Amino acid sequence: MSLGDIRNLDYTILLCSKMQETKQFYLDVMGFPLAHDSDNWVSFQVGSALLTLRPRGPWAAWHDGPFSPGSAAVQLAFRVAPHLIDSCYATLQSKGVTILSPPRDIPSWHHRALFFRDPEDNVIELYAEV
């Protein structure tokens, strides 16, 4: 086996300082279905993958170390159908989400995309292939 044999990204874990607020964001704003909810982590089903949130700090397998406030740790990109980008934008605005970049065409990527942040300051991209 080599690392080149890896074929799937099954789950992504976001380390959270604002666990409850971030959980509510992915439930209420993003509308992701809850797959698992426990005392120290929560997972949402996003297509065939899981998006998991856990508190920052010591963990069973390792300790994530110090956090630099204001720095984005990750950018998540979620694909939607092309006709949904503008309605997603309107929904985000109606829920009070601050938009970093409104929907725009990015020809070199073959995308129409918009960008915003979650409560942990992670950059979220919604995009459609065009």
Language model: regions and residue ranges:
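Short glycine-/small-residue motifs
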Residues: 123-126
